[in-house]
UniProtKB/Swiss-Prot annotation:
This is DNA primase DnaG. It catalyses: ssDNA + n NTP = ssDNA/pppN(pN)n-1 hybrid + (n-1) diphosphate. InterPro entries: DnaG_primase, Primase_DnaG_arc, TOPRIM_DnaG/twinkle, TOPRIM_dom. Binds two Mg(2+) per subunit. Keywords: DNA replication, DNA-directed RNA polymerase, Magnesium, Metal-binding, Nucleotidyltransferase, Primosome, Transcription, Transferase. One of its GO terms (molecular function) is poly(A) binding. It comes from Methanosphaerula palustris (strain ATCC BAA-1556 / DSM 19958 / E1-9c). Pfam families: Toprim_4.
Length: 417
């Protein structure tokens, strides 16, 4: 018995008969006129009996004394045998009592047709039924590398504080909020981060901050400000860096992390905002990354520090040819004492510089995105309200007076005098 699943080829024949004939006449003519023509191996009846040739499908119609139509025969023979069988059918010259002509119109390779359907269907499945996300070798490598970095996260003390592998050996540490922040910094090769995991700062972090150069790297939201306030009360923090508004440290990309850490500011510039002056304590503006003799320097009077800075200028002080400012701290130093104001871009380039007394007019004329304002004058509530809605993320000023309602979207920093 013939199975349609084994069909390889489909023979298409065209029939024209000079008279009216029926389907049985056509089938009888095919079997009768091909019998014994090709030998026993290619006898059409035997081929049908063994299932190598399918049923003969005849579609004809009679009109005006003529019969026309198509004949379809499926075959599972090889190409040569199928071609011979098709050619033999063209020898049919009569159907019933009528003269007839049979012509092979084509031999269709069913497998090619199936392959074409498979390709078309595969395209549909690929576009519509696969989940989003292609396999990327770089993503696979990043996942493996991140897993290795996660395994490298250590824990300090009995409190199991999450920390990078180089926290104890490094001369400087970066204090972040949680374990996810440490993992993200590890992802980009920063191995000296340690997490406070809440506002209750562990004693071991306090001890590390006393011995090493400590940078607080926190989210720029309310939670980050509360943690910084706690750190300023219990730990010796040297520098402060914040993530961009609306983004946490754990979500920052490598370029954003490097930029934020590069633009960290000494703690003196934010101390008044988050903690206020500590009675009886004077902190120097030593910007060196090392902290030898820090306790002795804290007791030096401001006048002596200024004399020392004049004799041995640090890398931040302008010399004969001042370098262009590259950090927020540089702009603070350049503006201090000059009664000017600078509008800065997100990359800390100068968008506009004007007299400090004319800053209100400059704000009204702003046409480009401004990330921050550094100004050598006292900022009051009225000036601060003008900056709301302008996209300004921070204001560094000589002082702040009469600030009753501080905008959550603007970070305030005091320029150390």
């Amino acid at each position: 018995m013939y199975s349609p699943d084994t069909t390889k080829y489909l023979i298409h024949l065209n029939l024209q008969a000079e008279g009216v004939v029926e389907k049985p006449d056509v089938v009888g003519a095919i079997f009768g006129q091909t019998e014994g023509l090709l030998g026993e191996d290619l006898d059409l009846r035997d081929l049908q009996r063994t299932g190598r040739v399918g049923r003969i499908d005849v579609q004809i119609s009679s009109k005006r004394g003529e019969t026309k139509g198509d004949i379809l025969i499926s075959s599972s023979l090889d190409r040569a045998e199928t071609a011979i069988l098709a050619a033999s059918l063209e020898t049919i010259d009569r159907v019933g009592p009528c003269v007839a002509h049979v012509v092979v119109e084509g031999i269709e390779d069913i497998r090619v047709t199936k392959r074409r359907k498979i390709v078309d269907r595969a395209k549909e499945l690929l576009l519509d039924h696969f989940e989003d996300g292609s396999i990327d070798s770089y993503e696979l490598l990043d996942e493996v590398r991140e897993a290795i970095r996660v395994e490298k996260i250590g824990s300090l003390g009995d409190e199991k504080i999450p920390a990078g592998p180089n926290v104890m050996d490094s001369d400087a540490i970066i204090i972040v909020e949680g374990r996810a922040d440490v993992i993200n910094l590890l992802k980009y090769g920063i191995k000296n981060a340690v997490a406070v995991e809440g506002t209750n700062v562990p004693a071991q972090i306090v001890d590390l901050a006393d011995k090493k150069t400590a940078t607080a790297f926190l989210d720029g939201d309310r939670g980050g400000e509360l943690i910084l306030r706690e750190l300023l009360q219990v730990a010796d923090i040297d520098y402060v860096a914040f993530s961009p508004r609306g983004k946490s440290v754990e979500d920052m990309a490598r370029k954003e992390i490097i930029k934020a850490l590069r633009n960290k500011v000494p703690v003196e510039y934010v101390r008044d905002q988050f903690y206020g002056d500590v009675p009886g304590e004077k902190r120097t503006q030593d910007l060196r990354p090392q902290k030898p003799g820090a306790s002795e320097q804290n007791s030096i009077k401001k006048e002596n520090v200024e004399n020392e800075n004049e004799s041995t200028p640090t890398s931040f002080e302008p010399i004969s040819e001042p370098a262009p400012p590259v950090t927020l701290h540089d702009h603070m130093e350049r503006v201090s004492g000059h009664l000017i104001a600078r509008f800065l871009s997100p990359e800390f380039t100068i968008l506009n510089e004007t007299r400090a007394d004319d800053v209100e007019m400059a704000i009204d004329q702003m046409t480009t995105e401004v990330s921050g304002l550094v100004i050598d004058r006292v900022v009051d509530q009225k000036l601060l309200d003008r900056l709301v809605g302008k996209g300004v993320e921070f204001v560094a000023a000589r002082d702040f007076n009469g600030i009753i309602k501080r905008p959550l979207s603007i970070r305030l920093m005091k320029i150390a005098q």
